Structures are given as C-alpha cells and as structure tokens.
C-alpha cells in the first residue's frame, strides 16, 4: 500500500518543456492524427513513469514512489500496446528506448544521474520523437518502418531545431546551477546559444520570411536569456 502523501507527479517541472517541444515540432511536419496524438500522450506519460522507476532505485523509502509508478506505468503500457498494434515497427523503437532507459537507470544506481552523458541520452530520447511523429503517420503497418529517405527536408530541419534548443537549454541550466562556479562553462553555453541562432536562421532561410522570423525570434530569445541570466548564477535551494 502506498504511503500517505505519496507523490504522483515528478518535481522537475522544466522537463515537461523538453517533452512538449519535440512533439509540437513533430506534429508540424507529420500532421495531427489520432495515432500521433496517442503517441504524444504516450511519450509524455513515459516521463513520469521513468521518473518513479528511477526514484524507487535512487531514494530512501521506495514505497513512496510505487503509486506514481503504477499510475503512469500502467497507463503507458496500455498506450504502448495500442500503438504497437497499429504500427508494429514501433516495437523496435520501444527496444531502442528501453536500452536508452537502461543507461538512465545505470546512472541513477551510481547516483550520477545529473552527469552530462546522462543529459545527452535524455536529449536524444526527446529529439528522436520528432521523426517518429512523422513516421507514425506514413501509413506503414508492418514490422518495417517507413523509409526516412522519403521524409521531407522540413523534418530534419525541425529535428535540428529541437536538438539545438534542448542542448542549449541543458547547458544554460547547468551553467546557472551545477556549473555556476565555472565561468568557462557559462561562456561555452553562451557561445553555443549564439551558434544555435546562426545555424537555425541558416536552416530556416529556404522556407521563407515567416519561418525565418519565427526562428530568429525563438533562438534569439534563447541567446538573450543565456547572456542576461548568465550574469547571476543561481544557488540551489
């Protein structure tokens, strides 16, 4: 029986943006269908399920986290079955994500889940959902996914946007907290934000003025945030 007051939501609220951005970008190129909506929901549900699975291994009184794992894990399992029934090739995707999650678990067991390498694995897990959102609407109903060589160039542009934004945000947050006493890392974060702005604008240029403007505003904001907030590093607690 779960302990009284057992949490059912992860406390890391910033992670939700990491989940939402790739889903939105994937829907922009792949379209919104019942299957893509179900995939998006399943991807979001997987995060709290994985959080509580790690928490059971990581923290004292693991019974506190069993309720959250049951709620999110069972919901995610139902969604996974429905998705695999509709797109059997998602079974291979699930296996790849299981391997990636095993890496997350290994870092958690070593009490090193905040390492840069573990962050990189989480970013890859998030960014990969962009092409998967496209593929799920491509109509393939067997064990072989649709050929990604047939995907529009827009897909890879938006995937690159997701990668740049998530890597930059991860570096920015680390520069404010875990690396707050490391001016070199803070400068590296700011340089990456500047390079991301230039790269994203170059990628958006072929798609017209509106795409160029939206991209410049989005990545320009990330650069300004890095420069302004980077002056006063935060202190934990």
Give names to the regions the model predicted.
Residues 124-193:
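Long hydrophobic alpha-helical segments that form multi-pass transmembrane helix bundles
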Residues 1-94:
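N-terminal topogenic module of multi-pass integral membrane proteins
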Residues 24-39, 80-92, 128-158, 199-212:
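Helix-coil boundary and interhelical linker segments in multi-pass alpha-helical membrane proteins
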Residues 1-16, 60-68, 105-124, 176-192, ...:
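Interhelical loop and helix-boundary elements at the membrane-water interface
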Residues 78-133:
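Hydrophobic alpha-helical segments and helix pairs
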Residues 186-237:
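Glycine/small-residue-rich hydrophobic helix-like segments
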Residues 42-52, 98-108, 126-128, 161-172, ...:
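Alpha-helical transmembrane segments and their membrane-interface exit regions
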Residues 20-23, 68-78, 120-135, 187-200, ...:
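Small-residue-rich segments of transmembrane alpha-helices in multi-pass membrane proteins
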């Amino acid at each position: 029986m779960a302990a009284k007051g057992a949490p059912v939501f992860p406390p890391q609220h910033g992670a939700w943006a990491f989940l939402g951005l790739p889903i939105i970008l994937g829907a922009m190129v792949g379209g919104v269908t019942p299957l893509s909506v179900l995939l998006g929901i399943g991807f979001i549900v997987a995060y709290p399920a994985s959080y509580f699975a790690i928490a059971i291994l990581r923290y004292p009184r693991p019974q506190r986290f069993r309720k959250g794992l049951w709620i999110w894990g069972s919901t995610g399992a139902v969604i996974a079955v429905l998705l695999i029934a509709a797109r059997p090739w998602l079974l291979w995707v699930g296996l790849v994500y299981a391997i990636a999650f095993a890496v997350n678990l290994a870092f958690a067991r070593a009490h090193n889940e905040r390492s840069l390498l573990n962050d990189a694995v989480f970013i890859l897990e998030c960014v990969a959902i962009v092409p998967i959102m496209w593929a799920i609407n491509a109509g393939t109903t067997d064990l072989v996914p649709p050929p990604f060589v047939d995907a529009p160039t827009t897909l890879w542009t938006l995937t690159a946007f997701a990668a740049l934004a998530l890597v930059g945000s991860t570096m920015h947050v680390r520069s404010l907290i875990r690396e707050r006493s490391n001016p070199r890392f803070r400068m590296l974060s700011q340089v990456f934000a500047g390079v991301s702005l230039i790269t994203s604008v170059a990628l958006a240029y072929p798609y017209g003025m509106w795409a160029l403007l939206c991209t410049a505003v989005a990545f320009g904001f990330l650069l300004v945030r890095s420069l302004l907030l980077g002056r006063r590093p935060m202190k934990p607690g």
